[in-house]
């Protein structure tokens, strides 16, 4: 009879472990990875960029203190992915993120989103709601005591039931009131066995809200239970990503429209149409009057090169197109010769910028090393120099380049002149029509630049601006 009590004692020791065994069995059978829905851009933004050299925590710190959350990490990874692969984010040129503001209504957390910063020119492609799903709260096992006359004196446990389903509810709000309004959408979710981030496609909800002009939305993760009052970590706050295609991004001056926060020239500092070296005070005279327009973007006095070498002499005969006509030798009359002499005297007597000679020689020597013919020159733009670094997260600077140089006749093949530029250079060389300028050295092929910045509501925005960096130059 001695072994009987021992077996009962062993069973009573194992009984408290039954709920844990059941929970482990359910977790082992139902374990799944993070469900990032079917949005390829969102999934690749967080899971496909593990080869980044910069850790997510360090990258998120670029958004400022307290911003090391998932939305910051997600946007930075989307930016890094575009820089590496060059693929448009989500098939468009714009990604907007919207942070949530938490409010407690009827002892339940409700998240509010302000989507009013979306521009009218931005055509919504897809939208995703990203949220952290808490691990399920399994009901406790209830003990069922045996009756006093039962032969089996051991106690039994009632198997715990399944956790409650999670309901995701979206409502639109009126801008004049803070109450929840029209129901925009609802979906039932099964809580995962462990806490993880999930994403749900809410494109139809966002498009309908924008069509109705109601861009103040609320989202509620309802479990049917009251909130226990445990504060939610700031890193687990939900957010919305909207992938759009900005139809106005190719318009002139689009980069300044979206990135410039204030006028770089305050009132009184600059007048449109005024000469660059003019002064508001008529008594002040500047020693900076250039006699002729710098059509080739070169420094004044660059022609004073020690070794006289025209740009055409630097090219072989085969580098030019064959000429179907004879050499051009325009005949000048007395009036033209007299006018030319006057222009020469005026140019010689005019003054240039009043820099010291050492600085001018250094600048000229730098340009002497560069080809005189139209070509691409190096230019690095630092956003801090133009006052945009306060809201631009990345890049801090970029290689913009620029085009400079002469497009004189005959133009070599390397400058890739257009047909119009070729005809214009011939007419100028003949000299029959006075006042015809040289063709201009302008960008031919340009590259896009992805910029990650903060909008007026401190939400991270990724935009891909076209024609930001010069790749090749040509005469036009």
From Swiss-Prot:
Highly expressed in epididymal adipose tissue, brain, bone and aorta and to a lesser extent in liver and spleen. Expressed at higher levels in preadipocytes than in mature adipocytes. Strongly expressed in glial cells of the cerebellum. GO terms for molecular function: cytokine activity; growth factor activity. Residues 39-63, 268-301 are annotated as: Disordered. One of its GO terms (cellular component) is extracellular space. Disulfide bonds join 374-441, 403-473, 407-475. PROSITE patterns: TGF_BETA_1, TGF_BETA_2. CDD domains: TGF_beta_GDF10 (cd19394). 3T3-L1 cells endogenously secrete biologically active Gdf10 as a unique complex that contains both the pro-region and the mature region. Growth factor involved in osteogenesis and adipogenesis. Plays an inhibitory role in the process of osteoblast differentiation via SMAD2/3 pathway. Plays an inhibitory role in the process of adipogenesis. This is Growth/differentiation factor 10. It comes from Mus musculus.
């Amino acid at each position: 009879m001695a072994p009987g009590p021992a077996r009962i004692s062993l069973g009573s020791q194992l009984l408290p472990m039954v709920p844990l065994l059941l929970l482990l069995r359910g977790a082992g059978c139902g374990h799944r990875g993070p469900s990032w829905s079917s949005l390829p851009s969102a999934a690749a933004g967080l899971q496909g960029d593990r080869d980044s050299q910069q850790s997510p925590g360090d990258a998120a710190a670029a958004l400022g203190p307290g911003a090391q959350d998932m939305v910051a990490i997600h946007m930075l990874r989307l930016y890094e992915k575009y820089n590496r692969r060059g693929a448009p984010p989500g098939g468009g040129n714009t990604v907007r993120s919207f942070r949530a503001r938490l409010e407690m209504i009827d002892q339940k957390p409700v998240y509010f989103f302000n989507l009013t910063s979306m521009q009218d020119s931005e055509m919504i492609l897809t939208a995703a709601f990203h949220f952290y799903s808490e691990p399920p709260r399994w009901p406790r096992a209830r003990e069922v005591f045996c009756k006093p006359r039962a032969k089996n004196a051991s106690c039994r446990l009632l198997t715990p039931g399944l956790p409650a389903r999670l309901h995701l509810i979206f409502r639109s709000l009126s801008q004049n009131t803070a109450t929840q309004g029209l129901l925009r959408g609802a979906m039932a979710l099964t809580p995962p066995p462990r806490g993880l981030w999930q994403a749900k496609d809410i494109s139809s909800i966002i498009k309908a809200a924008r069509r109705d002009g109601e861009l103040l939305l609320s989202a509620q993760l309802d479990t049917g239970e009251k909130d226990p009052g445990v504060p939610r970590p700031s890193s687990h706050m939900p957010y919305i990503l909207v992938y759009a295609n900005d139809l106005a991004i190719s318009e002139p001056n689009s980069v300044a429209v979206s990135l410039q926060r204030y006028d770089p020239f305050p009132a009184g500092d600059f007048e449109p149409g005024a000469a660059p070296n003019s002064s508001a005070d008529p008594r002040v005279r500047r020693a900076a009057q250039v006699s002729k327009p710098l059509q080739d973007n070169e420094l004044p006095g660059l022609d004073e090169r020690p070794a006289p070498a025209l740009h055409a002499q630097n090219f072989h005969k085969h580098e030019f197109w064959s000429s179907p006509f004879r050499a051009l030798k325009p005949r000048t009359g007395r009036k033209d010769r007299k006018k030319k002499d006057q222009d020469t005297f005026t140019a010689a007597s005019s003054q240039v910028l009043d820099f010291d000679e050492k600085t001018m020689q250094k600048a000229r020597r730098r340009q002497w090393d560069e080809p005189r013919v139209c070509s691409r020159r190096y230019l690095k733009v630092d956003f801090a120099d133009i006052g945009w670094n306060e809201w631009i997260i990345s890049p801090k600077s970029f290689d913009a380049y620029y085009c400079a140089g002469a497009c004189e006749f005959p133009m070599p093949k390397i400058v890739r002149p257009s047909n119009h530029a070729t005809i214009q250079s011939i007419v100028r060389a003949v000299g029959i029509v006075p006042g015809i300028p040289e063709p201009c050295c302008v960008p031919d092929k340009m590259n896009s630049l992805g910029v990650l910045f903060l909008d007026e509501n401190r939400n991270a925005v990724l935009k891909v601006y076209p024609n930001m960096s010069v790749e090749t130059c040509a005469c036009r």
